[in-house]
């Protein structure tokens, strides 16, 4: 019988920017630390390896192109040695891990999350369905197969990236699969302070909190920190530094949190510039209490009035076909 009570953990930290091997090594340290603390699940922020591409928001596409080759070189293959190293670390620490990473597949990058079991096995990998705003100049799109909730030793586990949490239909698709534990992977929250409230920590923490309430699930809101190396590499003018952090060219923007299925915060915030791991003890039986009041895809739904249609088929960019002597055509997806 599955244990309904266990400890979960969320990372709040900066990666080693655009240095995949160093970021993987840092991640392995967090995995070992969380496992030693008794956590059964550890959540990382969005594209934590090799870090969020902040240059997209700071200057022109022409200026930003200088960073693209290095970012590609430090993005990870889903079955590559860096991911396998994370798998080995998860198995050693006996902990489930959800890692946000920049995935490279052929010549295209994706904002991806990989689910690693406490046995060190990859149980699911998903891509952000639609990159946000200027992210579309760097990353490709996911497809309907990326909306999935998987069985794990910590219950029915799902994840989304960043502003996917303000997409009502995407959220509803996830809620409909009876998600119990959700990883909300976000970048840091220093960008455009006092200039764009919609990008700030207040409203986006609220988005994760509302996800917990609407979905009746535990939410691990993982937020990165904007590291000093990001300022040093990207901010070649005072104007760019001000855009990346109006409080000064210094680390910050970490606002990780854990929410219960009733929306209640379950831990204390760390200071926004402090790296560490947040922990909370969860009890999956709390979900039944939460859903007794609100179950928007169950007893509180009216499918005869409004309903959601989801195409969960993988998107294929090429299809091979062959024609035999009897003019029969066989198609093979590739």
From Swiss-Prot:
PROSITE patterns named among the record's database cross-references: CN_HYDROLASE (PS50263), NITRIL_CHT_1 (PS00920), NITRIL_CHT_2 (PS00921)
Active site annotation, chain numbering: 46 (proton acceptor), 128 (proton donor), 162 (nucleophile)
GO biological processes: detoxification of nitrogen compound; protein homooligomerization
Keyword tags: Hydrolase
Domain CN hydrolase: 6-284
Enzyme nomenclature, EC number: 3.5.5.1
Molecular functions per Gene Ontology: nitrilase activity; nitrile hydratase activity
Domain of life: Bacteria
Annotated Pfam families: CN_hydrolase
Reaction(s) catalysed (UniProt annotation): a nitrile + 2 H2O = a carboxylate + NH4(+)
Description of how the protein assembles with itself and partners: Homomultimer composed of 12 subunits.
Task performed by this protein: Nitrilase that mediates the hydrolysis of aromatic alpha-hydroxy nitriles to carboxylic acids. Has high activity toward mandelonitrile and mediates its hydrolysis to mandelic acid. Also mediates hydrolysis of mandelonitrile derivatives. Has weak activity toward aliphatic nitriles.
Similarity section: Belongs to the carbon-nitrogen hydrolase superfamily. Nitrilase family.
Protein name as it appears in the record: Nitrilase bll6402
